[in-house]
Amino acid sequence: YIQNIDNIGFVFSGSKKHLLTQMFTNYVKPFYAQATPLELLPIPKERFYAFVKEKFEISGKTITKESFDALYELVDGESWLVQNVCYHLWQNFENVEKEHIEPMIKEIAAMSDAIYKMMFDNFSNTQKSALKIIVNNKGANLLSKDVLNLNDISKSSLVSALNVLLDKEVIDKSDNAYYINDKLFEMWLK
């Protein structure tokens, strides 16, 4: 049906990245090879800063470039988190400085403490360990002997836990490194 509609483009989007990927890359799925994937990358830092700075200035407030850069790096340019933190900074400070950033992120993470505790409690002990290993190793070299020995976990147990977390879409993998999809949850785990 979609193939027969003229002059209409379709956009498939959502938060279930692996389901969307499978729709177009699994040869048994009906949309196999029928779309061009487009990954939305973080907003470039300079452009994002110009936007945020303008919004602060409109209300007579300031945010330094140094503080914005620190925020952007801490949250890996994740748009919703940058905006959320900036909103709270704007609410609480006339002039945002670098030293305001980390405490504000911790405060925001603490607001979700009950949710994150409940979520974390639903994971098996091995999955909890896997999440902590991801955080402590920045997602890289998780299956190295050093990491396995340091965390007293077998390779098969860690691989199994990682696969479950991937299936649940709690984590994802890119360039041979794992990362936690919810950056604020990752910061809460720290």
Residue ranges and their predicted role:
Residues 11-12, 40, 181:
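Small/polar loops that bind or transfer phosphate-bearing groups
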Residues 6-8, 33-36:
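Short glycine-/polar-rich loops that comprise or flank the Walker A/P-loop
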Residues 36-47:
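Conserved AAA+ ATPase "SRH/arginine-finger" region at the nucleotide-binding site
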Residues 49, 53-115, 173-175:
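Amphipathic alpha-helical "lid/sensor" segments that cap RecA-like P-loop NTPase cores
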Residues 3, 114-117, 122-190:
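C-terminal leucine-rich, beta-strand-based interaction scaffolds used for sensing/assembly
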Residues 15-19, 43-45, 185:
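Conserved nucleotide-binding/hydrolysis micro-motifs of P-loop NTPases
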Residues 1-28:
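Sensor-1/coupling segment of RecA-like P-loop NTPase cores
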